[in-house]
Amino acid sequence: MRYHQYYPVDIVNGPGTRCTLFVSGCVHECPGCYNKSTWRLNSGQPFTKEMEDKIIADLNDTRIHRQGISLSGGDPLHPQNVPDILALVQRIHAECPGKDIWVWTGYKLDELNAAQMQVVDLINVLVDGKFVQDLKDPALIWRGSSNQVVHHLR
């Protein structure tokens, strides 16, 4: 997996103070997407064990209380990203108790395959659906267009 940006402290992409990772790779290519630079799978930089360790350390850093992590992109549920995203969320569950995990994807919840559902089974919130320019609404919270759904899973 590759990623474009990691924010160790973020107050924009989800509730509370959190970490945010923007991964590379998106097949949806939504017109009007605010993050087009993340579409190509080979863009950005490699997601390494060192970066994964940094995320875990940041989530456990007691100097700044972080509520959890937001995974966006690109698309964390792109088939090529799923193995690394699954490993990351499993590790967060094991090593960062009490931290919530939010994932944004262009796929719809009812369209996900078994591998993608393994990730969804471990997260707290899934924001699903492609961004639709004609349905854009700046008043929406945690989503860009009114067709997208915020699923509070656990």
Curated annotation (Swiss-Prot):
Keywords: 4Fe-4S, Cytoplasm, Iron, Iron-sulfur, Metal-binding, Oxidoreductase, S-adenosyl-L-methionine. It is found in: Cytoplasm. S-adenosyl-L-methionine binds at residues 32-34, 74. Gene3D superfamilies: Aldolase class I. Pfam families: Fer4_12. Its EC number is 1.97.1.-. GO terms for cellular component: cytoplasm. It catalyses: glycyl-[protein] + reduced [flavodoxin] + S-adenosyl-L-methionine = glycin-2-yl radical-[protein] + semiquinone [flavodoxin] + 5'-deoxyadenosine + L-methionine + H(+). It is an enzyme of class 1 (oxidoreductase). InterPro entries: Aldolase_TIM, NrdG, Organic_radical-activating, Radical_activat_CS. CDD domains: Radical_SAM (cd01335). Forms a tetramer composed of two NrdD and two NrdG subunits. Activation of anaerobic ribonucleoside-triphosphate reductase under anaerobic conditions by generation of an organic free radical, using S-adenosylmethionine and reduced flavodoxin as cosubstrates to produce 5'-deoxy-adenosine. Belongs to the organic radical-activating enzymes family. PANTHER family: ANAEROBIC RIBONUCLEOSIDE-TRIPHOSPHATE REDUCTASE-ACTIVATING PROTEIN (PTHR30352:SF2), PYRUVATE FORMATE-LYASE-ACTIVATING ENZYME (PTHR30352). This is Anaerobic ribonucleoside-triphosphate reductase-activating protein. It comes from Salmonella typhimurium (strain LT2 / SGSC1412 / ATCC 700720).
